[in-house]
Amino acid sequence: MPGTKAPVVFIHGLWLHATSWAPWQELFAEAGYEAVAPGWPGDADTVEATRANPDSVANHGIDDVTEHYVKIIDGLPARPILIGHSFGGLIAEKLLGMDYGVAAIGIDAAQIKGVLQVPLSQIRGSLSIFANPTNRHKAVSLTAKEFRYSFGNALSEEESNALHERWTIPSPARPLFEAASAALSPHSPAKVDTANEDRGPLLLTMGGKDHTVPEAITKSTLKQYRHSSAVTDLVEFSDRGHSLTIDSG
């Protein structure tokens, strides 16, 4: 039908449950969009149920999570607008490059293949996970202290702790290992078709206080698209951290 708005698919990243998108879904629904926020493979319907069964989310990697969303998109009436946060942003970029979306927004998106910067704050935030190589096949959780550093550093401790309690879930560590080793693998799951000339527009956002995906990573991600004439833009929120999709700011 002429004038019908594209559906919207929200894609969460590691450690946040899909229901954390609920306020966004309501906002988009009020504007006339059909908005859905499916979880990753193995995610239960609630935060509590997902926490109770961490093994169900273990060992899922970037490719099978992407394929999970491909199947969801195939069931929609039209190609959607993709909005992803962190690793959800990376997956949104992959899907856009595969022509499974009409447009995409990567909010503090995880690094794709070709991004070589590894800022110290990112190393500190993930060191405990990489210290044990067997974590690659496990589900891992963040303590309130770890969440405060990686997500809530731009917030009060009280708000950070409240968000940790409300939204966090165990998540597969495998995507972290895949992204970290992308430079060593020609066919890395973190590879995105950045040269696609026919894809829809892409907006990347970055938080100036983000410890998990510092600005240097997002700026380098933007450079990976330099060989495509498709629209790619970048917006900075200078006072925001990685929690910007769920916090009060």
Spans of model-derived segments:
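Conserved alpha/beta-hydrolase "acid-adjacent" motif
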Residues: 211-220
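Gly/Ala-rich beta-loop-alpha elbow adjacent to hydrolase catalytic centers
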Residues: 83-88, 92
